[in-house]
Amino acid sequence: MINLHNAENEKEAEMQIGTPTDVKHVAHIGWDGGSVNHNPPSWMKDFKVLGGYSPALIGNIKEDASCIFEDSTRSRDIPRLPKSSRERSSTLGGSPTKERSRRRGSSQYNGNPKVSRRSSKESSAIPQDGGFNKKSRRKKSKDCVDGGSRRSSRRVRGSQVESISDSSSTSDAGYLT
């Protein structure tokens, strides 16, 4: 006989799981802190500098970045047109789809451009009382309440043909009496 009482008294070594704040985020791995002289992280010291890369050069590139944006000021010299005149100028050489989308936004759809013709016709067909055509449902017979199979039978007038529908199995094709 095994003594269960002794097995319960023995304690296994408990594992302690640290809190989420004990985990170092991946983005911080290798970061030695913000140094003023832009030294690479300690894990980067093992790699050789290729192609004249140095942190000092990156600082110069950031300072000289203003020369890249000289040409971008030319687009600012062009005066901005109001929205209505921009639409007119775009439709002169624009596509017919833009014209159609602008027409849809007109007042013939109650001022709401999202309403389409189909949905406005369908909304008029819905009865005002909010009722929809609901199909009537048959009540389950007492035989079906407890999860049993449902069988129905009917006789065709003037003949002995009987149709049986069985929802649980097709092998039981006996006649109901």
UniProtKB/Swiss-Prot annotation:
PANTHER family, sorted: CRIB DOMAIN-CONTAINING PROTEIN RIC8
Protein name (database record): CRIB domain-containing protein RIC8
Protein's gene: RIC8
Low complexity: compositionally biased ranges: 158-171
Compositional bias (Basic and acidic residues): 72-89
InterPro entries registered for this protein in UniProt: CRIB_dom (IPR000095), CRIB_dom_sf (IPR036936)
Function: Functions as a downstream effector of Rho-related GTP binding proteins of the 'Rho of Plants' (ROPs) family. Participates in the propagation of ROP GTPase signals in specific cellular responses.
Coiled-coil intervals, chain numbering: none
One Pfam family here: PBD
